């Protein structure tokens, strides 16, 4: 949108996000003012502007729909967000010995140790003292900055942890999430730790995500996505619930584009995170509610038991222990394989990458839901006719219509399974497996119209610029990783292998000098395998250099992204397989890169 010599831009304070002060060196302090950033011509050059526009758009659409059903007291609606931030913490001294971790944020080579996460003994276990000191100090600093941190715990992989705050208005929650990442990075450094926000820093163990718990509230603080005791007769809940499902059905590919990054590409669909197929999980009770509404029948009895006014549980669980009270079971279990799941009174967008800002995914989700709300409001206006407000039967008629339309997106099973891949294809749900393919969804005519006309949160140039930036960032990331791997091979991996090979060769010479038969000596087999592996790695390094050169010379950034995906990534994966085998063979004293067993334990 702007050429190199056009440099003027403007910042405007976002008054919905409070100012804050951070301590700086030499007993000084810095006042930070959250702002939007626009160009001389008024184009949005940041992520905050589009998010604020989407918040305004969804508020207008939601208020319009609420007024149609008689909720005329509501003047404004806000989207709320609670962000679960996952990350790894490793020793900073060891991290500095790994150029790939320092430069790329992930290990480009490294074999999985015998023990990693298979015992499932790290999740929710006791935190190491240095980690606990780091996270608790981070929480204290964040409290001073107004960030309402709430929970912390061990995650599944060794060295992996999570922090989460109380939900807030979406734009403020995004600001606070970015602030959390910054403060955690700074505090970890003081404790001689390195925080890794990369989605897949270690191959073979779980990666990290950023679960975005999204909901809609009125200006009086009522959560619109709270099902209440009888969701089947709650018109407000039903309308907004089905609107969100329909939004994902219509624009799931757009949500896939929002989470497409070079780092998240390593995590999605890896049997540890949601797949690249966007679907919606509702749970048994709400599935039954929608099915009953669609079929115009009574809902099955779920033995609802209410504990307090804010918590609706399912059946009672009696542990048969006199000293323990019975507890109320939730109406629905969690499906951790679903990328977009309803969890009690909110939707959890689980596919967002741990390193990326939540702003863009939430912006596109808001836009998709806004379009759905407007479409549903149009239908409801037609059906209610001359009546002042729509009746419950009018609402159910419209809801029924959109239940049928959006049914293909609902899936309650295992999203990791091959059966779901095949079933999704039958339902016509796209399976987008690469970033370049996902980026193109932003300029798909249907999605582009939503973002620039129906819900105008971007101008056409703004949207095209983001498409260009996504491709450019993807290409640069892979070029950096490819060049880093080249350096690792030349400066670390091959020299280590040659040193060990020299020792084995000298051992064989000594054995031969003593008159021993070395033709079947185990040293000879090891020597030959090292030779085979180093030869193959060297050949593939040449292929990698050619791929890097070809991508670097490609002027069309979209074509360059496709080449980077198909050529650079493939060669890097091939190299890694041989290097990881070599790591298992070379004696530890010769292997100059810290191994997973040292980094994670």
Predicted region positions:
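C-terminal amphipathic alpha-helical interaction region
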Residues: 393, 399-601
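Glycine-rich, acidic/polar active-site loops that bind/position phosphate-bearing ligands
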Residues: 1-197, 206-467
């Amino acid at each position: 949108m702007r050429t190199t010599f056009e440099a003027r831009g403007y910042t405007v304070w976002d008054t919905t996000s409070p100012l804050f002060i951070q301590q700086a060196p030499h007993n000084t302090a810095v006042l930070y003012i959250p702002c939007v950033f626009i160009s001389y011509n008024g184009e949005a050059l940041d992520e905050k502007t589009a998010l604020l526009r989407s918040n305004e758009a969804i508020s207008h659409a939601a208020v319009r729909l609420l007024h149609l059903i008689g909720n005329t007291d509501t003047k404004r609606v806000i989207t709320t967000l609670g962000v679960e931030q996952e990350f790894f913490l490793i020793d900073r001294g060891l991290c500095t010995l790994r150029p790939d971790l320092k430069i790329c944020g992930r290990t480009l080579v490294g074999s999985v140790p015998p023990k990693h996460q298979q015992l499932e003994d790290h999740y929710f276990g006791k935190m190491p003292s240095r980690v606990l000191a780091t996270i608790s100090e981070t929480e204290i600093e964040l409290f001073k900055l107004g960030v309402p941190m709430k929970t912390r715990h061990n995650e599944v992989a060794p060295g992996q942890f999570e922090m989460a705050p109380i939900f807030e208005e979406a734009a403020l929650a995004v600001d606070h999430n970015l602030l959390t990442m910054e403060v955690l990075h700074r505090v970890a450094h003081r404790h001689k730790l390195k925080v890794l926000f990369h989605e897949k820093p270690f191959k073979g163990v779980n990666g990290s995500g950023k679960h975005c718990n999204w909901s809609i509230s009125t200006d009086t603080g009522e959560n619109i996505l709270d099902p209440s005791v009888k969701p089947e007769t709650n018109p407000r809940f039903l309308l907004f619930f089905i609107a969100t499902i329909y939004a994902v059905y219509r624009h799931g590919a757009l949500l896939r584009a929002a989470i497409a990054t070079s780092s998240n590409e390593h995590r999605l669909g890896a049997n540890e995170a949601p797949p690249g197929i966007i679907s919606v999980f509702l749970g048994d009770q709400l599935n039954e509610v929608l099915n009953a509404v669609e079929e115009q029948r009574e809902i099955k009895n779920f033995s609802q038991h209410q504990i307090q006014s804010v918590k609706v549980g399912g059946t009672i669980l009696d542990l048969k222990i006199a000293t323990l009270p019975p507890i109320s079971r939730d109406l629905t279990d969690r499906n951790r394989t679903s990328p977009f799941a309803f969890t009690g009174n909110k939707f959890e967008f689980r596919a967002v990458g741990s390193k990326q800002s939540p702003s863009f995914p939430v912006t596109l989700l808001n836009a998709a839901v806004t379009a759905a709300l407007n479409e549903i409001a149009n239908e409801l206006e037609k059906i209610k006719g001359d009546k002042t407000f729509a009746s419950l039967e009018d609402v159910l008629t419209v809801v029924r219509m959109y239940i049928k339309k959006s049914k293909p997106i609902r899936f309650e099973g295992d999203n990791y399974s091959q059966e779901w891949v095949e079933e999704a294809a039958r339902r016509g749900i796209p399976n987008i497996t690469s970033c370049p393919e996902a980026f193109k969804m932003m300029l798909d005519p249907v999605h582009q119209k939503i973002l620039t006309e129906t819900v105008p949160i971007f101008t056409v140039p703004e949207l095209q610029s983001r498409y260009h930036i996504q491709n450019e960032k993807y290409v640069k990331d892979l070029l950096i990783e490819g060049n880093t791997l080249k350096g690792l091979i030349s400066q670390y991996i091959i020299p280590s292998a040659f040193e060990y090979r020299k020792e084995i060769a000298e051992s064989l010479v000594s054995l031969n000098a003593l008159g021993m038969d070395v033709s079947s000596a185990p040293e000879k087999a090891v020597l030959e395998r090292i030779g085979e592996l180093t030869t193959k790695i060297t050949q593939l390094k040449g292929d990698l250099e050619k791929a890097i050169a070809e991508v670097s010379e490609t002027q069309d950034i979209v074509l360059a992204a496709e080449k980077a995906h198909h050529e650079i990534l493939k060669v890097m994966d091939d190299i890694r397989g041989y290097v990881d085998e070599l790591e298992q063979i070379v004696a530890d004293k010769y292997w100059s890169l810290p191994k997973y067993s040292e980094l994670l334990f």
